[in-house]
From Swiss-Prot:
Stated family: Belongs to the adenylate kinase family.
Recorded superkingdom: Bacteria
GO MF entry, a single one: ATP binding
Sequence positions that bind AMP: T31, R36, K57, L58, V59, G85, F86, P87, R88, Q92, R160, R171
Reaction catalysis annotation: AMP + ATP = 2 ADP
Keyword ATP-binding: yes
Name of the featured protein: Adenylate kinase
Nucleotide-binding recorded as keyword: yes
Pfam families assigned to the protein according to its UniProt record, in alphabetical order: ADK (PF00406), ADK_lid (PF05191)
Binding residues annotated for ATP, in chain numbering: G10, A11, G12, K13, G14, T15, R127, S136, Y137, L199
Amino acid sequence: MRLILLGPPGAGKGTQAKRVIEEFDIPHISTGDIFRKNIKEKTELGQKVEGLLAQGKLVPDELTIEIVWDRLDQEDCKNGFLLDGFPRTIPQAEALDEGLAKRGLKLDRVLNIDVDKDSLVKRLSGRRVCPSCGASYHIDNNPTKVDGICDACQTPVIQREDDKEETVLDRIKVYDSQTKPLVDFYNKQDLVFTVDGTLPIDEITNKLVTELKKG
């Protein structure tokens, strides 16, 4: 099963991706994870990506496409995958369709998690992370036990640069202009299933899994 997961930043795609890949035993291909690995290892690509993300901008198509196809051509993707964070633009979607066609493959479904702007800003700007152990928190729904201190390792938690409200609004604007049109692009191929991302997490999962099991 070859799937794409769409939705604005803060829609809960990561949570749903984990549940879907467990249910259908396919790998989760997250461009965000690939980029973060490069950033952590301070590769040349990682430094470019870090600068762009800090400004709420997208990584250029040619870099992203190269990384994605290198991953999709690996053995564990032979029977399917869940793409999260790619494609983000119409040219990327066209490049993906072209690459799949060359390999005699096609997409099965595009899952779209829809969340309103106010909810997204509240979710994202409330995030806090531990710079030491990577634990994540939220000031409203998952706060630290001691204010501002990581429960696991007692390091002061921080707000990531791309979770600050101004950057969040920029990220949403970029999503609306560049990625949201993908819903129309894939609707023309009759592939899109949209779910309300403000519903309880388990309810969202149930709707996605039920839809995918329809075949």
